[in-house]
Amino acid sequence: MNDYVQALLMILLTVVLYYFAKRLQQKYPNPFLNPALIASLGIIFVLLIFGISYNGYMKGGSWINHILNATVVCLAYPLYKNREKIKDNVSIIFASVLTGVMLNFMLVFLTLKAFGYSKDVIVTLLPRSITAAVGIEVSHELGGTDTMTVLFIITTGLIGSILGSMLLRFGRFESSIAKGLTYGNASHAFGTAKALEMDIESGAFSSIGMILTAVISSVLIPVLILLFY
């Protein structure tokens, strides 16, 4: 099959499956009918049925990635609109994100250490709460497995976006700052998309949480590895 035709088919497959997954969730509101999850499972099913490799899918998937990279600029709008509230709460934002990052590191590092996993596995899993573009680079530079890091980043994001609303209700989080930072810190872009569905203010704080988590983690993960290895 011509590469351009295959790329177009993969793009159409992704867009169509996501569209119907979104419509399904709108008709049957349920956190487990997450459009990203349903569309991903649908894509995997189609690839397996027709024997299409990951590289074959990425002939079209890479174009979608380029478009998504450009759309990140859209996150600047909620940040700009809520800039005054962000400036008024800088210390709270930084302290909250730093605490979340450290708790994540402790959970992953101590658990894997206790079970005797190697440095490579620990490095692969530590960036799981960082947005993919940064997390992959951190894992690669420290000797982790890129493909597994991507898998854990996606899984973390999906779990956060699916269970986040239930956990926020359970914790009785009312503040848009708390909701947004929780989503951005724990489940990066997936969580930010979910926060934006709630309201633009939560989306703004989720964006800043996601950005700070990526920056802090990319600095602290190498330090942690140097200290213990």
Swiss-Prot record:
It is found in: Cell membrane. The keyword Transmembrane applies. InterPro entries: CidB/LrgB. Keywords: Cell membrane, Cytolysis, Membrane, Transmembrane, Transmembrane helix. Coiled coil: none annotated. It is a multi-pass membrane protein. GO terms for cellular component: plasma membrane. Pfam families: LrgB. Its main location: membrane. PANTHER family: HOLIN-LIKE PROTEIN CIDB (PTHR30249:SF17), PUTATIVE SEROTONIN TRANSPORTER (PTHR30249). Belongs to the CidB/LrgB family. CidB subfamily. This is Holin-like protein CidB. It comes from Staphylococcus aureus (strain NCTC 8325 / PS 47). The lineage of its organism: Bacteria, Bacillati, Bacillota, Bacilli, Bacillales. The gene is cidB.
